[in-house]
């Protein structure tokens, strides 16, 4: 209290304990920072309640979290202390307030616990007062019952038996009396649980609703218990679940080695990419191959279009490894993963990918007719083993050679057209026309026409002799008769 009194006389002490109004508004508003003469307390900035002891002029807590507004316009007169409060302070002197020393006590003088620093002399004096102020208890026995008559001299705010103040025995020896008093005070200061219980009882008895509201806010904002748990997270928004799903999909379709799934669809068609009239594919019955015709103007895809098992590019494998890899019976068995893969990639067959405009007019090696192996041959093992090593390698890599017997439909069409032209040219060569000598008269034209008709009738005159053979047919003959006629004809020759 003396320090508080001295602090009231010192204006610098009052100024350093007064809150900075700029800092209360925002920490960045005060431009002085640590050089500011007023107090910068973060706890007071978030707490809107004023310090009761600050208005009384005796707040000695440097870390007080209540606000200390300026006191120039306030009345500095101090009210006299209530005798009941003095008696209560004499009783509560040995019990320091836990909330006050943690900067959270909002009861002021109504708090039943000590709000001042505890010294050894104060502990001895308060312990003596506590022993003298205990009520006298007289016990009288009536029969088997014990009747207790107590005389209460001071009303204790804590009526619970768990909140009774521990008495410190006073030693007669003055040398050890002070040490025992200090040890008793330290023992009583460790009962924090009793402080909490008594403060809860006093909160129920107090009529200050604003104080109760403050403690309710403090209980709501207690650290360590306000834990927010979100149980509504779905698997779709879970990053770990998405990464796991993507990795599973990659492992599931790793055997296909697909970079662009649209190009591997058997129904993929891009009219802007193919600048030609659509052609069709067909099956070569002689060898059992299905070819995809790509006429002139088509360009290479980034990946080869096949319907068989796909190989990674830029790999060279021997023929024995091809036999072991591609003709394993397990590779030709269907599974659930393959079925799901085909179903997934057939759903996007109508997607058309645009190609750069500068590739439409490209020419060169890409303009040649290309085809890819679509189905395995009917007699796959025997026919492939009979192929040469180079041809077998090209076949398995999807780059099939172009022999004459494996011509495409477009090649067949060109071939047929060439044959027709050859036949027409042969017919024209059989009937050579005379050199043009000039215009002819009508008589000459009729004469040439008669000559052509006579030659035609001469050629048809031989047909009755041929048909006479059919007129001599008498019916079916036995084998012996046929042999006899054959032997006769051979003898006649």
Curated annotation (Swiss-Prot):
Domain of life: Eukaryota
GO molecular function, one term: zinc ion binding
Keyword Transcription regulation: no
Record key words, sorted: DNA-binding, Metal-binding, Repeat, Zinc, Zinc-finger
Zinc fingers (C3H1-type), renumbered ranges: 14-43, 45-71, 91-118
Protein known as: Zinc finger CCCH domain-containing protein 34
InterPro entries, alphabetized: Znf-CCCH_3, Znf_CCCH, Znf_CCCH_sf
Region (Disordered): 397-477
Residue ranges with Basic residues bias: 409-420
Record field: compositional bias (Polar residues): 452-468
Gene3D superfamilies found in the cross-reference section: Zinc finger, CCCH-type
Record has Cytoplasm as a keyword: no
